[in-house]
């Protein structure tokens, strides 16, 4: 009986050591992958896998499900495409920044020297602020600020090289969507860019599955903005469409735009 128990304990101990070894190998691999990204020139492109490696190292605190969403966001959203469009060493306002994943990745990739993220969710901002503390040791010269603020209460003062509005408008009531869009545009400095992405409203089955996603995670019935409407709002505001892309990840459809503010307003 004693020999049997001893053998059982030894098997459990060996299994625990193997699991610990795999965890250490996985962690070291993630650290090395992220360090490779940090060491690259800012002009170098990143992959979706790079986004996952960065997220796993930066977002290590908070609820397990929240960490899971951050670690795997790159599987359903073209974050690397957004990063590729942002110039090196810019300052950015991220409206509806959530947990700060985009700002974190831009910072590690050398695309951001100063970032201000705002979101109406205090829990999301708490996660972003925790990430900012970790980023401070990785990229010490970056200035990051995350603030809990409702869009209806107004945006931070000042102008920025880049203003990002990513997956926000479909959460805004239809009667306030155009105002929120144009208000964010007012924070783009002359010659700067307005980086916009939202979920597609067609085909119907992609739009429907996107809607089910938000019903499950945000408990919200979302309201799509046709990309044609966003293009019209931007051009009426004096911006030009510099980049127009459509992307799919799994069943998720994404419409991406870069709207450029002229150096000299008409």
Language model features with spans:
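Conserved alpha-helix/loop element of class I SAM-dependent methyltransferases that forms part
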Residues: 72-89
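Class I SAM-dependent methyltransferase Rossmann-like catalytic core
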Residues: 56-76
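Conserved SAM-binding strand-loop segment of SAM-dependent methyltransferases
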Residues: 138-152
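Conserved SAM/SAH-binding beta-strand->alpha-helix loop
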Residues: 121-123
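C-terminal alpha-helical "lid/dimerization" subdomain adjacent to the S-adenosyl-L-methionine
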Residues: 196-237, 243-251
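A conserved beta-strand element that flanks and buttresses the S-adenosyl-L-methionine
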Residues: 164
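Conserved SAM-binding loop of SAM-dependent methyltransferases across substrates and taxa
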Residues: 99-111
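A short, conserved alpha-helix within the catalytic core of class I
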Residues: 172-183
